[in-house]
Amino acid sequence: LLAVVGIATVSLVAAMVTTVAPASAASNCAKLIGPGYAQLKNKTVTMFTSILDPELSKYQNALKSFTACTGIKVKMEGSNQFEALLPVRVKGGNAPDIAIIPQPGLLAQMVATGKAVPAPGKTVANVNKYWSPGWKGYGTVNNKFYAAPNSANMKSLVWYSPKQFTKAGYAVPTTWAQMFTLADKMAAAKQTAFCGGIGSGGATGWPATDWLEEVVVRQFGAKTYADWISHKVKFSDPKIMAAMTTVANWMQNPKYVGDVKAIATTGFQDAGLGIPTGTCMMLQQASFYAAQYPAGTDVSKSGDVWAFYLSGINDSVKTPVEGGGEFFAAFSKRPEVQELQNYLSTPQWALSRIATAGSGGGWLSANSGVPLSAYKNPLDQLSAKYLADKHSTFVFDASDAMPAAVGAGTEWTQLTSWFADGKSIADVAKAIDDSWPAP
């Protein structure tokens, strides 16, 4: 109990409630939220999340149409101790009606309590219609579908400078082989083809986990990737060691990156700052990296910096995409909860939330029913094109889905030693495998 109280007292918590708008606001409901919702006035659904203001307010604003059209109020509570508090609340009989869960592993943990409930039929139908099987799979536990996806983020991008490419006469590569032909040209011109930095304080090493993940899914596909997360395929498996060799030929090749050891001490946020001036030419990093460039940087297709899709390696793996996101998991079967679940799995919800993000954007959905034109930020359009591709091979960040002792522990430290100390692939793989928690 003292531990629980301790967690609660340091938690930053914000609670907000949607209010019912005047009846006139509900006149266009079929367009605003879609048809077929029950009128359930004076009902309230509680939602618990790690999202805090200002983003929490944007969620509340995006839900106003739903409340106006159904009468169902939504009370959202955000906490920076969400991942610690949710299991405590669920096991203690104080579960929220809906939780926005950021990791598939936490969803599985909640299902194991017996308190999470499978998604209603209409939600399942929406997810089947609008999301790729990969996305649906991450909301599924023990062959039962529980949680519709919420937002999405895109990792499979390579940052570059359109201005520097134009100046040098380079074309954006559209295949893995083309990217390395281009890197060879850059090396011949005495340019640093790839920037790199895996420094991140106590989380140093995480960018290297992303590079390995990008290669594993591209070389060996989603099945091997999933088996790697569960440790059916070990790090010492020939496939994973082959993927590590591919990463080494890419990001540990002095011809392409210069000083390999410097990658271990360069902060990830600083790694690509030389791209606008041509100090280095390409950086594999997620869509959020745009925020690292200083004010005044032209982030556009013909500007100082832009990004292209990191191409596949194995033609049998269709459009590999690594990303992340959150999922709506319910702990109640009350009609008002299911109505909200249904709405949160529609393009109408995604469009409402995108609109509240404003012209700067930054909120993405992998819902294929959302037109790319809904995004006002061109970078969001680029990311959403791949995230919402129903034929893509989508995978979730593997280190986030592995046991924390590995994915946020030994994998970080061992991959850092790989870069900083030249530790062998075999020794790195063995050390990570040996650290895997016993079942």
Give the role of each language-model region.
Residues 1-24:
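Secretory targeting and sorting signals
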Residues 23-108, 122, 427, 434-439:
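Conserved N-terminal structural module of periplasmic/extracytoplasmic solute-binding proteins
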Residues 28-39, 104-156, 207:
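Hinge/lid segment of periplasmic solute-binding proteins
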Residues 36-39, 120-131, 198-202, 218-242, ...:
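Short, solvent-exposed loop/beta-turn-alpha elements that line the ligand-binding surface or hinge
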Residues 146-150, 180-233:
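Extracytoplasmic/periplasmic solute-binding protein
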Residues 229-261:
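Glycine-centered hinge/linker elements that transmit conformational signals in sensory
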Residues 295-361:
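Extracytoplasmic/periplasmic substrate-recognition and gating elements
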Residues 365, 380-436:
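C-terminal capping/gating helix-and-loop segments adjacent to ligand/active sites or protein-protein/ligand interfaces
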